């Protein structure tokens, strides 16, 4: 069961879309961060984050920089990451998956596509 999802994206519109999309998950809290550095602050403040939705192209600390640092933190190893980005370059997809992401969804995406991936990752 998903209780807390951290969405990391520099677009307020995307955060609103996630909020609407994630309303289907009962008792699930959406935590928003505008870049990778802010995401680390949220991870330190919020316990029990179950999933991270991560954009690639962001200011301050991009998604791949975040993933590189994230994978070095033992405390976060159990939190799955789904990359959701307009960055559709094959090398970014491969790099993100090699860095530990559990999935990659290209924007724009269908809600059913993201839902299926979340369900697959959230299922024991």
Where are the model-predicted features located?
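Conserved acidic segment of CheY-like receiver
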Residues: 2-13, 18-22, 52
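Acidic, metal-coordinating helix/loop segments flanking the phosphotransfer/catalytic sites
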Residues: 32-51
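Receiver (REC) domain active-site loop signature in two-component systems and cognate sites
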Residues: 58
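Short, conserved "switch-loop" micro-motifs in signal-transduction and mechanochemical regulators
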Residues: 87-88
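C-terminal output helix
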Residues: 109-119
């Amino acid at each position: 069961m998903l209780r807390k999802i951290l969405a990391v994206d520099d677009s307020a519109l995307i955060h609103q879309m996630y909020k609407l999309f994630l309303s289907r998950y009962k008792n699930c809290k959406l935590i928003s961060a505008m870049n990778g550095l802010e995401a680390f602050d949220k991870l330190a403040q919020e316990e029990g984050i179950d999933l991270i939705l991560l954009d690639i192209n962001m200011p301050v600390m991009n998604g791949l920089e975040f993933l590189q640092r994230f994978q070095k933190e033992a405390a976060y190893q159990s939190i799955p990451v789904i990359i959701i980005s307009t960055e559709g370059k094959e090398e970014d997809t491969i790099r993100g998956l090699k860095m530990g992401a559990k999935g990659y969804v290209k924007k724009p995406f269908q809600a059913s596509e993201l839902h299926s991936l979340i369900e697959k990752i959230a299922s024991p």
